[in-house]
A protein has these predicted regions:
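Well-ordered alpha-helical segments within folded domains of soluble proteins
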Residues: 129-133
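Interfacial/capping segments of alpha-helical transmembrane domains
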Residues: 95-106
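Alpha-helical transmembrane segments
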Residues: 81-85
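Alpha-helical transmembrane segments of multi-pass membrane proteins
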Residues: 87-96
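Cytosolic-side membrane-entry/anchor segment at the start of a transmembrane helix
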Residues: 106-114
C-alpha cells in the first residue's frame, strides 16, 4: 500500500515538474515575442501611448470603430463573413464527432501540455505580459513597445466585451456539461452555457494579431500566431469548447486586433473593406483585406 502511494506521489511530482518546465519555457517564448516587437523600429518617442487620459479617449474611439465596422461593409465584406460563417457551420455539424475523437485520445502528457497553453490564453497572463512590455518601453523610452502593450490590452478588452455579450445571448452548452453540441439556453448567465464563442481563443488571437501587426520581425509573427493557435486548441482538448467555438472566437480576435492596429496607424481610415475578389475567366477566390 505504501509502495503504491509513494509511486503515485512520485508520478504526481514528476508531472508537476514537467508542467513547471513547460510553463517557464512557454512564458519565456512569449516574453521574447513581446520584447522583440519594437526591434527595428526607427520611430522616435513622440510621447504618445502612455497611461493618461488619452488612453481612454482612444479606447472609446477604437471600440466604436470596431463595433460600427459592419455598418460600413459592402458586398465583398458580406462574402467574407459568409465564408467564415460557412466554415463555422461546417465545424458545427461535426462538433460532436471532433469532441469524441479528441477526448478519446487524451493522455496525462497531453493534459500537461494543454494546461500550459490554456494558461497562456488566460486574460490575466496576457495583461501581465503587456504590462512588462509597457514597463520596458517606459524605462527605455521605446514608444513602439508602449504602443504594442496598450493596443494589446485594448484589443483584449474589446474582444472580451464582445465575446461575453455573445456568450450570454447564444447560451451554448459547453462540452463538459455532458449536453449535446446542439443544446442552447439563450440569455443564460450560467458559465456552463457560455461556450460560444471561445473567449480564450478570441483574447489570445486579438493580442497575437496586435503584436504581429506592430512587429518588424517575421519570427515574432510566427511565434505569436503559433502560441495563439495552441492556446486555442487546448480549449478543445480540455473539453471546455467545441471546435466551432474556437474557430469563430479565433476569427473574431484576429479581426479585432487587426482593426484596432490599423486604426492607430498614421493616416488610417476608419472604414474596413474585407472581401473576396473573383478573378476573370476562372473560379479563383482571393481574400482581400483593406483597412
Amino acid at each position: 500500500m505504501r509502495v503504491g502511494l509513494k509511486h503515485a506521489q512520485s508520478t504526481d511530482v514528476t508531472r508537476k515538474t514537467r508542467k513547471r518546465c513547460l510553463s517557464a519555457a512557454t512564458l519565456a517564448i512569449m516574453l521574447f515575442c513581446i520584447l522583440s516587437t519594437g526591434m527595428g523600429s526607427s520611430r522616435t518617442d513622440s510621447g504618445e501611448y502612455k497611461l493618461d487620459k488619452e488612453l481612454f479617449r482612444r479606447f472609446g474611439r477604437d471600440f466604436k470603430g470596431v463595433f460600427s465596422s459592419p455598418c460600413h461593409w459592402g458586398k465583398k465584406d458580406a462574402l467574407t463573413v459568409a465564408a467564415i460563417s460557412g466554415v463555422g457551420l461546417l465545424l458545427y455539424s461535426f462538433d460532436g464527432d471532433i469532441n469524441s475523437w479528441v477526448q478519446g485520445r487524451r493522455t496525462p502528457s497531453s493534459d500537461d501540455v494543454a494546461s500550459v497553453f490554456s494558461y497562456v490564453g488566460n486574460g490575466g497572463v496576457l495583461v501581465g505580459l503587456a504590462g512588462v512590455m509597457y514597463a520596458v518601453g517606459a524605462i527605455d523610452h521605446k514608444e513602439s513597445w508602449r504602443k504594442t502593450a496598450l493596443l494589446s490590452v485594448e484589443s483584449l478588452v474589446t474582444a472580451s466585451i464582445l465575446v461575453w455579450g455573445t456568450k450570454v445571448i447564444v447560451g451554448r452548452a459547453r462540452p463538459d456539461t455532458n449536453e449535446s453540441s446542439h443544446t442552447f439556453d439563450s440569455f443564460s448567465f450560467d458559465s456552463g452555457y457560455q461556450s460560444f464563442p471561445s473567449g480564450h481563443a478570441a483574447g489570445v488571437f486579438a493580442v497575437a494579431t496586435t503584436i504581429a501587426e506592430q512587429s518588424d520581425v517575421l519570427a515574432v509573427d510566427i511565434i505569436a500566431y503559433s502560441l495563439a493557435t495552441l492556446a486555442s486548441l487546448s480549449r478543445i482538448h480540455d473539453n471546455r469548447h467545441w471546435a466551432s467555438d474556437v474557430f469563430i472566437g479565433s476569427a473574431l480576435g484576429y479581426f479585432i486586433g487587426k482593426k484596432i492596429s490599423d486604426l492607430n496607424r498614421p493616416g488610417a481610415k476608419n472604414t474596413v473593406s474585407l472581401g473576396f475578389d473573383f478573378s476573370h475567366g476562372r473560379q479563383a477566390l482571393t481574400l482581400s483585406i483593406r483597412f
